Amino acid sequence: HFAKKGIDSGGDGLICVNNRAGGHLGSHSMEDMYKELNDLGLPLICAGGIGSEIELYKALKIGFDGVQMGTRFVASTECNTLEDYKTAIVNASEEDIVSTTRLTGVPVSVIKSEGFRKDNTWLFKKLLESRFKHKARMILNLSSLFRSKYYLKKNNGKNSKKIQSLYSAGKSVHTIHKIESATSIMQHLGQSINISNIYN
């Protein structure tokens, strides 16, 4: 449905967000997404769960034209975010990545932390299942935004335990072992992948 909407809107390609992505995640595996979308005639970019050359190779071997990597580059020296966020990614395991609807009303992948709550209150659960779901999502989005701004201001721009659950990350965290420069990350990926082996 959404892929066809993208095509009808004149998109040059499709970002295929799978069920291992950070942030707003999809509901299908990368394999299933490719099978479902590969006959649409547009380049397909795999997004979700790509943190090292192993997952990159797998995505290209399946048939994707490229990949989109988010979590890996959050844990880079150039990324302008909290150092605690980067460290949380490096220290996290795949089992630490959980999905919550509390932030925006739709499933979001975050790093589980102290005080984390996965589900919304019963009231928002009901609203998200009703004809008011779009308004409920807007309220949750605004609430998350103002809450994070409040705690950052309260702590003079520093992180606090109150906003740790806002650390979005995908299941590729288990492949990330240190904070590196974007150049180093790209060089390693490029040197590790033998393109000729993928397409032969």
How would you label these PLM feature ranges?
Residues 25, 47-48:
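Residues that cap or flank secondary-structure elements
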Residues 1-36, 76, 80-82:
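Glycine/Thr-rich beta-alpha phosphate-binding loop at enzyme active sites
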